[in-house]
Every structure is written in structure tokens, then in C-alpha cells.
Amino acid sequence: MLKRCLSPLTLVNQVALIVLLSTAIGLAGMAVSGWLVQGVQGSAHAINKAGSLRMQSYRLLAAVPLSEKDKPLIKEMEQTAFSAELTRAAERDGQLAQLQGLQDYWRNELIPALMRAQNRETVSADVSQFVAGLDQLVSGFDRTTEMRIETVVLVHRVMAVFMALLLVFTIIWLRARLLQPWRQLLAMASAVSHRDFTQRANISGRNEMAMLGTALNNMSAELAESYAVLEQRVQEKTAGLEHKNQILSFLWQANRRLHSRAPLCERLSPVLNGLQNLTLLRDIELRVYDTDDEENHQEFTCQPDMTCDDKGCQLCPRGVLPVGDRGTTLKWRLADSHTQYGILLATLPQGRHLSHDQQQLVDTLVEQLTATLALDRHQERQQQLIVMEERATIARELHDSIAQSLSCMKMQVSCLQMQGDALPESSRELLSQIRNELNASWAQLRELLTTFRLQLTEPGLRPALEASCEEYSAKFGFPVKLDYQLPPRLVPSHQAIHLLQIAREALSNALKHSQASEVVVTVAQNDNQVKLTVQDNGCGVPENAIRSNHYGMIIMRDRAQSLRGDCRVRRRESGGTEVVVTFIPEKTFTDVQGDTHE
């Protein structure tokens, strides 16, 4: 019942009620004790007064017969007997009748007897009777005082029992209502601090502890949910950061790889494979233009190229099937403000989209590819200019030294030949041979100077061949056909000069000797070799064409040997002449091993 009465109260009110109860018990005990003690107050003084009356009685008895000088003693005793303190004490303790009897006896009998007595024996009995009455009065005061003191002790004991019961109740109540719930809350708080949100506080009732336990349970549940959400976000953020780290690492590796000195295929293929692994893009294809002509380009893909010459290369994936669903084709142009270098093509599956990071990755990689291709083309032009300048310098030095010496020797031989019959026959034959050798040397020097002065106005072999075909088309009077099938930048510039000179020499021979109406120049790739073919439908090369003074064929064979290749000149079965040159183009490998295979 007490529990039901206390349950609507809050913990603070319940504690206040317990404090009020203990205070009330204490105050009640103190009030009763005070009241009882107040009743005892004055009893000792009254007993002292009564005792003094006995002493004064014996003094008067000793003074018999009384005289005038003893009247102050009588007056003092009368004041004591009729004092207000003694009257109040007797009235409080129920001894008023006894006191009044003693007072009447004193006034009516004892005083007159003392005044008449001439000796002590006559009034000794009266004094003894008065003292006996005083003893009874004092005994009454003592009994009343002892009773009051016993009552105070009893009240104190009762109050102590009540206080002990209240203390026991308070301890039990504190353990049930405060200590145990508090331990549960502390245990739950400790569990929450250690990220354990599974514990719950089971606190009954409708007090503050129950409300706090319910609030902590709700908070723990919400924290568990929040932590789950936060952990999921952390995992997502971690995955995002790892992906960004992979992107940054890929961009750094790609930038390092693209700016190495390895061949273009070894630089681009790993980059395209890495891009396909980091994004949703599939069937990635990079087309690198030889010039601004989009039709003439070199393709780099992530799919294995069955026509690739290097079958042992692991740069392209093997056994990878293309995606069945083509999806959406995306394009990124590799161009700057001056030149278009190529285009990047890729397929995005249906219903998928590139994320912001993936889009930035592709854009950054496109910028890197553009910068790499621009730098390669610039370096190619610079290398070509350097080669042209070196050749022009060599041509000037040849012209200023050997050409002048040969011209001087020809004039000296001409002077000797002008002497005619003055010279012996053997000398004239020797001079004729010397002049023929000088003419041959002069012709070879002219061809050499022509070669060194040959200019490649555009980077790459194809523009130079196209320009040469246009030049000889004007000389032939009909178009010289060019069938160019090589990928861009397959032939280095120093080899392209020799190949171009061989083609020009073959066209020059056809112009001088073939009387052809059709000339076709074909440049193709056969496995890992480059094959140059110049065909005409003219009269054909004679069987004894290979002789010492046929300098055109000698020049073509010498240049083919410079290419570490082979040059064959033969008569076509259908008529005409065919010049075939085959060689393996050189590859520029990186000076430091490992630049492209981190």
C-alpha cells in the first residue's frame, strides 16, 4: 500500500517525504522531551527550598526562646515557605494541598508555639511534625521528577525505534529505487562508452529512474542505428577514398608511362587496360592520327589484336570476349588549339553512367594523352629538323669541298685531252677512263647532294611520299598512285629518308627509262617487315641492267643496305618493272629498364 501511495510521487518528492518523516519524528521526540523536561524544570529548586525550610526550622528551634533579634529568621522562613517557586512546583507536581497544609500549620500552630516556648522541649515535637511534612513534600517532588525522567527516556526509546525503522526502510528503498537502477544505468553507460549498444535497463515504475532508463534505452537504440549508418558511410567513404587513391595512382603511373621513351604501343596499351579496370567503360579504342586526316590513323585497343606482330607481348589481354550489349558509344577528342591528334572511343553499358570521379579521370587522362601525343609529334618534328639541318650541312660541305675538287679535276682532264695526238695512245685511254670515273663520281655526288637536300615538310613518311607522287605526276603527265597501308609512325624519320629516296630513285628511273603510262607506289606491312613496291607498265628493265655504270640501281641497293634490308629489281610478267624493298623498322626502347613495367 505504501508502495502504491509513493509510486505517484517523484524520486525527489519521495526523498523529501522520507526526510520530512525523519524530521517530524525527531521534532516530535524533541517536543515531547522538551515538554517533559520543562515539567521537571524547577523541581530541584523546589526540593532545595523544602530542604532549606528544614534547616531553618532547626535554626529557629535552636534559637528558642525567641527574641526580637530572631524575627528576621522567622520572616526569612515565612518567605521561603510561601515562595512562588515552591508554590508553582507543588501545583505542577500535584503537591499543592500538601504545601498549603504545611503553610497553614506553619502560620497557625508552629509560629505561635515558637513564640510562646521558653525552652526547646516544648516545641520540639511541633518542629519534628513540620519537618516530617516537609519530607513528604520532598518525596512527592522526587517521585514526580523520576516519573517525568522515565517518561522522557521512554519517549527517546520510542523515537529511536521509529528512527531505526525509518532508516531501515530508507536503506531498502534507496537500494530498490536508487542503487540498483543506478547500477544498471552505470553499466549501460559503460557499455555505451565501449560501443556496446545491446544492453538495456530494466527499471520498473514511473519515477525518474524508470524514465531515465527508458530514455537511455531509446538513446542506445538510436545510437546503434546511427553507428550502423555511420559505419556504412565510413565504409562508403573509405571505398571512395581507396578508389580515388587508385585513380591518383593510376594517373601518376599513366603520366610516368606516357612520358617514357618506350614505343607508343608499350605506353598506351597498359594505360587503356588500367582505364577499363577503373571505370565502367568497355571496348576502349584509341585512334592516333598520322596527320589531321582522320582516315589515316593507328588504333590501340584493349582487345587482343590478332594482327599484332609481337605475339609474346602481354600488354593486351588474351582470351577476352567483347561485351555482347554494345551500349552507348562515347567519344573524347585528343586535340589542342592547333592540331587534332586522335580520338578516344569507348562503350558504356546500357543503363549505366560514369560517376563524377570517373568522368574526371577520363578527362584528365584525355589531357595527358593529348599532351603526350603533342610532345611526341613535336619531338618528331624537332628530330626531323635536326636531321634535315645535319644533311644540309653535309651537303654544303660536300659541295664546297669534293664537288669543287671533282670539277677542278674534270677541267684538268679536259685540258689534257685537248692536246690530242701529242699524247701517247696509252695516255689518251687512261685519260678517257679517268674522265669516265670522274663523271661517275660526279653523278654519284649529285645524287648524294640531292638526297641530303631532300626535305620532309610534314612529319611522317606518308606526307613525303604523297608530295613526291604529286611531283612526279606532273613530270609523267598522269597521276602516280600511292597505296599507303602502314600505321602512323611505324618507320623512324632517319629510315624514312632512305625509303623516300629509294622511292624517288625508282620513280626517276621509271620516268627516264620505262616509258610507262601507269605507276603505282605501294607501302605495306608484312608481319614485322615494311615492304615498298614501285611498279610500272613500261618496257621493263633489261636483263643486263646491273652493270657498273647503272648508278640508280646501285644507289637503291646501297640505301636498302643502310636500312638493313633487301632491294630487288625485276621485270614483271605482265610487263613493266617492279622495285621491291623490304626491311625491319627500328624500335626505340627506353634507356632505363622498368620505366614502363613498374
UniProtKB/Swiss-Prot annotation:
* Catalysis: reaction(s): ATP + protein L-histidine = ADP + protein N-phospho-L-histidine
- Those parts of the protein on the Cytoplasmic side are 1-14, 175-598
Mapped to this chain, the residue ranges on the Periplasmic side of the membrane are 38-151
Q: Where on the tree of life does the source sit, at the highest rank? A: Bacteria
* Positions where Phosphohistidine occurs in the chain: 399
Membrane topology listed for this record: Multi-pass membrane protein
- GO cellular-component terms in the record? outer membrane-bounded periplasmic space; plasma membrane
Do you know which InterPro entries this protein is assigned to?
A: HAMP_dom, HATPase_C_sf, His_kinase_dom, NarX-like_N, NarX-like_N_sf, Sensor_HK_TwoCompSys, Sig_transdc_His_kin_NarX/NarQ, Sig_transdc_His_kin_sub3_dim/P
Which residues are in the Histidine kinase domain? Answer: 393-587
The protein's Enzyme Commission number: 2.7.13.3
Return one GO MF term: phosphorelay sensor kinase activity
Domain HAMP residues, every copy:
176-228
**Could you tell me which PROSITE patterns the record lists for this protein?**
HAMP, HIS_KIN
A single BP term in Gene Ontology: signal transduction
Keywords attached to this entry: ATP-binding, Cell inner membrane, Cell membrane, Kinase, Membrane, Nitrate assimilation, Nucleotide-binding, Phosphoprotein, Transferase, Transmembrane, Transmembrane helix, Two-component regulatory system
Transmembrane stretches, start-end: 15-37, 152-174
Task: State its location(s).
Answer: Cell inner membrane
NCBIfam families, per database record:
PRK10600.1
Q: What does this protein do?
A: Acts as a sensor for nitrate/nitrite and transduces signal of nitrate availability to the NarL protein and of both nitrate/nitrite to the NarP protein. NarX probably activates NarL and NarP by phosphorylation in the presence of nitrate. NarX also plays a negative role in controlling NarL activity, probably through dephosphorylation in the absence of nitrate.
Q: What is this protein called?
A: Nitrate/nitrite sensor protein NarX
Organism encoding this protein: Escherichia coli (strain K12)
